[in-house]
């Protein structure tokens, strides 16, 4: 059995961007599955708020779990609201109402304001 070459460094543990191809026994190459995460976006926001601060991979994992959890809660609540109102489409109105129901006080106000701003920016760029 040939020895693995030492020239190419092994991918870091926990690396999310695995696009290299793994070698199979029969010689065929297969792509590794891509692991989706919000880490790029969390990092961009961190640098906007605190440019001189870093984040550990464990903390990034926690942030990724947090974003996924909030996303699922908002989507679930918006789906319920659409169902209650006999609608088959989740619109920005359902999302906004779901955010108001799920997030407490001032946080909900800021989230709605930022969401409205993002939707306005998106529609004006079309």
Swiss-Prot record:
N6-crotonyllysine: modified positions: 6, 12-13, 16-17, 21, 24, 35
InterPro entries: Histone-fold, Histone_H2A/H2B/H3, Histone_H2B, HISTONE_H2B_site
Modified residues (ADP-ribosylserine): 7
A UniProt-annotated Pfam family: Histone
Region named Disordered: 1-36
Function description: Core component of nucleosome. Nucleosomes wrap and compact DNA into chromatin, limiting DNA accessibility to the cellular machineries which require DNA as a template. Histones thereby play a central role in transcription regulation, DNA repair, DNA replication and chromosomal stability. DNA accessibility is regulated via a complex set of post-translational modifications of histones, also called histone code, and nucleosome remodeling.
UniProt-recorded name of the protein: Histone H2B type 1-N
Biological source species: Bos taurus (Bovine)
